Amino acid sequence: MCKDSACFLTMKETDLEAVATAVQRVAGMLQRPDQLDKVEQYRRREARKKASVEARLKAAIQSQLDGVRTGLSQLHNALNDVKDIQQSLADVSKDWRQSINTIESLKDVKDAVVQHSQLAAAVENLKNIFSVPEIVRETQDLIEQGALLQAHRKLMDLECSRDGLMCEQYRMDSGNKRDMTLIHGYFGSTQGLSDELAKQLWMVLQRSLVTVRRDPTLLVSVVRIIEREEKIDRRILDRKKQTGFVPPGRPKNWKEKMFAILDRTVTTRIEGTQADTRESDKMWLVRHLEIIRKYVLDDLIVAKNLMVQCFPPHYEIFKNLLSMYHQALSTRMQDLASEDLEANEIVSLLTWVLNTYTSAEMMGNVELAPEVDVSALEPLLSPNIVSELLDTYMSTLTSNIIAWLRKALETDKKDWSKETEPEADQDGYYQTTLPAIVFQMFEQNLQVAAQISEDLKTKVLVLCLQQMNSFLSRYKDEAQLYKEEHLRNRQHPHCYVQYMIAIINNCQTFKESIISLKRKYLKTEAEEGLCLSQPSMDGILDAIAKEGCSSLLEEVFLDLEQHLNELMTKKWLLGSNAVDIICVTVEDYFNDFAKIKKPYKKRMTAEAHRRVVVEYLRAVMQKRISFRSAEERKEGAEKMVREAEQLRFLFRKLASGFGEDADGHCDTIVAVAEVIKLTDPSLLYLEVSTLVSKYPDIRDDHIGALLALRGDASRDMKQTIMETLEQGPMQASPNYVPIFKEIVVPSLNVAKLLK
């Protein structure tokens, strides 16, 4: 009742919903007054739609009713069939119970049938049994003639006869070993023929890469024979599940043996490529690896293009050969890695393993694509072995670089003693071959390392810079020893100045080469940071160059010593040409120094200028002369001014092109001359004060020596000047370069000077 009530409510709701929808639809149609004229047209159209929907609904209901009627009919038929089957099963069960005793009484008949089957098999194979010796001979002849397919056909006949007889015997009396042995013995030659045929097959497979090019039919025959044997193996193993019998020599597993033979052949081919040893050829490993590369590439191309046509697809012959070659190469590379390799041999091996193997020259060759995916290949050497080789290489390379640098320096040292001048570069600067030799060696090792990996390249660069740092320290020591040796006998070496210039220039070449090396081989900021953390070599190179320049200037001033000693003496005052000789000597030396590269020549010129002025002022402070009159003071002061101008002109000439101020130092001589030239002693304090204000490093002993040189200052005046200057010490300007600081006044105390 509840169900009918719910259905009624649902129908009522549906009617109400339909009415509401209709009202809404009519309202939508009649929104304007002019649409009232079309009411009849709208009504007829809706009536047609209603009739169409009702017709489709009736057809659908009728179809559903027909389906239900058909289903009921089929269910009725199925029920009748089930009843019939049930009755038939009952009849079969009844008949089976009644026939049990009858079946047991037929056991003798069953045994007779089995015996008959065995005898029938014997009769069927009788012809083959009698012809076994003849078939054996024919098979042997065919094998020797190379007719492998025909030989295998006859071998199959022999094995089939033997296996059939033995199987029947096994079924009839599995425990009768004597009869089984008799049959096996009669067919004893069969196993020997099988082994002989197998040898021929393996020989063909061992030369398969040659055979496939010359006689692919022979290789196809071998594969067909192996495939036949595989089918026989599968059939016998299936029969074993039913009978438990397996013929002797089965399963042969010739397919498995075929892949084993191919694997051994590949291994032998890889191992047999080593034609030389280290003793007979230093490049033995490079030659060995190149032969391997060529052989493997050629073999795989042949396998891809030709061998795959001779084997069934499911053998995946190319994939298997690729795996065999890869494994054989991995084993060979491990064997080579375990040997005591030299540094260049380690590089050759790692370059081949890490780069050549996967490159377009080998596994990445377009002729092997797409079957060979280099990204899927396992590494030939494990990361641990590669790491050990790299460690060994770095250790050996370190020792080699140290030895190479030592030898290069020894060779360069021998050149320093030559009687001939060193070579000059394209700009005319003296140089030796040392920087070129050193950086050529670095370049070679870096290029080699870059072939292996970027990481190794960076490590080698760091190593080179480290060893360069140590090398430059030794270079500095050797240059110092060279200088000391020359000072012991200035006549030797003959070209001391020229080779010392070359040593100085080498420092600039080393600097430029280091910058070039870093720029070329450092690609990332991380690498640059790594190398910048290494000790800077600029300081050592500048120290070597500075020492070299100092030694050359020392050479100059040793020659000038005699003429410097003439300054501020009676001879000088009477007209000595010491300054003329000094200028000529300095200019002559600087003609040789023109072979020094610009940065160092600039510093050397400035230092020579400063030192000449210092030596001149030192002569002033040496108390070699004391002027006795105003005329002598005037004459001496004017001579000092003229000589200052001479020196100024000289060093302007030497410093041309450097942008150096060649006047500052010579102005000091002029300032001192002004103090000497002063005619009014009462103004002496003012003049000295001016001098002290310009040169704050001037000391009391310098003033005392200067006043003593004038020869006209009273003791009280000297004392007053000295005390006044002591009360107000002058402050030096930030840019002032001390010049009097180096000048030592002879050990006469101030009191004596004042007297």
Curated annotation (Swiss-Prot):
Q: Acetylation: is it a keyword of this entry?
A: yes
- Chief location bin: cytoplasm
Gene Ontology BP annotations: membrane fission; mitotic cytokinesis; protein transport; vesicle docking involved in exocytosis; vesicle tethering involved in exocytosis
UniProt xrefs under InterPro entries: EXOC3/Sec6 (IPR010326), EXOC3/Sec6_C (IPR042532)
- The organism's superkingdom is given as Eukaryota
Give the modified residues of type N6-acetyllysine. 38
Q: What GO cellular-component annotations does this UniProt entry give?
A: exocyst; Golgi apparatus; growth cone; midbody; perinuclear region of cytoplasm; secretory granule membrane
Q: Where in the cell is it found?
A: Cytoplasm; Cytoplasm, Perinuclear region; Cell projection, Growth cone; Midbody
Q: Which UniProt keywords apply?
A: Acetylation, Cell projection, Cytoplasm, Exocytosis, Golgi apparatus, Protein transport, Transport
**Repeat: is it a keyword of this entry?**
no
So what does this one do?
Component of the exocyst complex involved in the docking of exocytic vesicles with fusion sites on the plasma membrane.
Oligomeric state and interaction partners are given as:
The exocyst complex is composed of EXOC1, EXOC2, EXOC3, EXOC4, EXOC5, EXOC6, EXOC7 and EXOC8. Interacts with EXOC3L1. Interacts with BIRC6/bruce. Interacts with MYRIP. Interacts with SLC6A9.
The record's similarity note reads: Belongs to the SEC6 family.
Indicate what this protein is called per its UniProt record: Exocyst complex component 3
Q: What is the lineage of its organism?
A: Eukaryota, Metazoa, Chordata, Craniata, Vertebrata
The primary gene name is Exoc3
